[in-house]
């Protein structure tokens, strides 16, 4: 489902999100790169932007 977008986050923020959602790095990476569009992926993207300062970038 890659729309040519991604959410940019620092390494520390990625670690905190993985811990908060109890997910693996590949799950986080696929969500932030818009490769998946599940309910969990949408929650991860929303949290990354609203709580961890993530920036959405179009490729």
What are these regions (language model features)?
Residues 8-9, 19:
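Short amphipathic helical patch at the helix-1/turn junction of helix-turn-helix
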Residues 13-17, 51:
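DNA-recognition alpha helix
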């Amino acid at each position: 489902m890659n729309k040519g977008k991604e959410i940019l986050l620092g390494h520390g923020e990625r670690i905190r999100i993985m811990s908060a959602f109890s997910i693996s790095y590949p799950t986080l990476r696929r969500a932030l790169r818009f490769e998946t569009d599940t309910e969990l992926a949408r929650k991860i993207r929303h949290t990354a932007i609203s709580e961890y300062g993530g920036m959405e970038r179009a490729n």
